[in-house]
């Protein structure tokens, strides 16, 4: 069997309420475990609407037919009214995920806030935002969270430094191939990073592949060895857990028939993480994604 890391981002109130239960059902049906990363604070995702003024973001929204893909409640969340508190109202679903023996980690306190402001926050504010999320998720689960995945892959050397004191087992904050330990400001290797190398649904549908051909496209990608390490794939509760749930169901079945086994990201870590190579986490760009994001680079 070929192991592929499965990262599941839960960005919004609706994704948690409607997408997570469906994903838990599908994953149980196919006997798959994955890594769920939850946003636990206010759902302000609708505040991204101002980015429609940016041509690349507008093109992405039109290409992916965002209104039907995500729903108007997601696209307007936190605009004309205060964003709903995801963790306070839907924490039981996070506990259900943990009880089902999936890996559970922090995505963000405020997904919109992190994605929109990471580039200008200082180290203290980055640490404060992480602490808000960690404390909330710890309280929800009744235990300490030991992994995280940056919202929108918005991460750079400063966020790497800010998250280091939290003692996570690993972070999944960037794009690239192969696990590594990012170098900190003093030259020491930091917490292991598990980069995502495969494209997400919204990054390729509409300009590189059609909706109906996406599963075939992804399975072809999985059949090709990555540049380094193992494949890591990200889905979103708002997409694969709601409007594309049937297609994701079919993908899980076809992958299993082809000898592909999805696993939590933590299963990809070696028994001794200090054996991982060092590298750098830097800002970069990626086709199909608007703005900058964290990328793996050579040390």
Curated annotation (Swiss-Prot):
Q: Which Pfam families match?
A: Polysacc_deac_1 (PF01522)
Q: Which residues form the NodB homology domain?
A: 2-263
Keywords recorded for this protein, A-Z = Antibiotic resistance, Hydrolase, Lipid A biosynthesis, Lipid biosynthesis, Lipid metabolism, Lipopolysaccharide biosynthesis
Principal EC category:
hydrolase
Q: What pathway does the UniProt record associate with this protein?
A: Glycolipid biosynthesis; 4-amino-4-deoxy-alpha-L-arabinose undecaprenyl phosphate biosynthesis; 4-amino-4-deoxy-alpha-L-arabinose undecaprenyl phosphate from UDP-4-deoxy-4-formamido-beta-L-arabinose and undecaprenyl phosphate: step 2/2; Bacterial outer membrane biogenesis; lipopolysaccharide biosynthesis
Q: Which GO terms describe its cellular component?
A: membrane
Functional summary from the UniProt entry:
Catalyzes the deformylation of 4-deoxy-4-formamido-L-arabinose-phosphoundecaprenol to 4-amino-4-deoxy-L-arabinose-phosphoundecaprenol. The modified arabinose is attached to lipid A and is required for resistance to polymyxin and cationic antimicrobial peptides.
Instruction: Please give the HAMAP family that the UniProt record associates with this protein.
Output: ArnD (MF_01870)
| Protein name as it appears in the record | Probable 4-deoxy-4-formamido-L-arabinose-phosphoundecaprenol deformylase ArnD
What is the source species? Answer: Aeromonas hydrophila subsp. hydrophila (strain ATCC 7966 / DSM 30187 / BCRC 13018 / CCUG 14551 / JCM 1027 / KCTC 2358 / NCIMB 9240 / NCTC 8049)
Q: What is the lineage of its organism?
A: Bacteria, Pseudomonadati, Pseudomonadota, Gammaproteobacteria, Aeromonadales
């Amino acid at each position: 069997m070929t192991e592929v890391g499965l990262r599941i981002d839960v960005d919004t109130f609706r994704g948690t309420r409607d997408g997570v239960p469906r994903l838990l059902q599908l994953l149980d049906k196919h006997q798959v475990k994955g890594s769920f990363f939850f946003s636990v604070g206010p759902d302000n995702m609708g505040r991204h609407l101002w980015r429609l003024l940016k041509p690349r973001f507008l093109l992405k929204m039109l290409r992916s037919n965002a209104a039907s893909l995500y729903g108007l409640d997601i696209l307007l969340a936190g605009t004309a009214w205060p964003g709903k508190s995801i963790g306070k109202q839907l924490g039981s679903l996070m506990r259900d995920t943990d009880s089902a023996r999936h890996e559970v980690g922090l995505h963000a306190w405020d997904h919109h806030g992190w994605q929109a402001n990471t580039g200008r926050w200082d180290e203290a504010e980055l640490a404060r935002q992480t602490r808000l999320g960690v404390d909330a998720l710890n309280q929800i689960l009744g235990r300490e969270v030991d992994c995280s995945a940056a919202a929108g892959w918005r991460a750079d050397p400063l966020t790497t430094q800010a998250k280091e004191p939290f003692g996570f087992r690993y972070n999944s904050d960037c794009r690239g191939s192969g696990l590594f330990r990012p170098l900190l400001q003093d030259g020491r290797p930091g917490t292991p990073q598990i980069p995502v190398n495969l494209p997400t649904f919204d990054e390729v549908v509409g300009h590189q592949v059609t909706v109906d051909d996406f599963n075939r496209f992804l399975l072809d990608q999985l059949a090709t060895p990555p540049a380094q390490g193992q494949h890591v794939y990200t889905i979103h509760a708002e997409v694969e857990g709601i409007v594309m749930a049937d297609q994701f169901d079919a993908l899980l079945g076809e992958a299993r028939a082809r000898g592909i086994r999805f696993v939590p990201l933590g299963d990809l870590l070696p028994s001794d993480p200090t054996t991982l190579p060092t590298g750098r986490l830097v800002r970069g760009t990626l086709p199909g994604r608007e703005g900058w994001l964290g990328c793996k680079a050579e040390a």
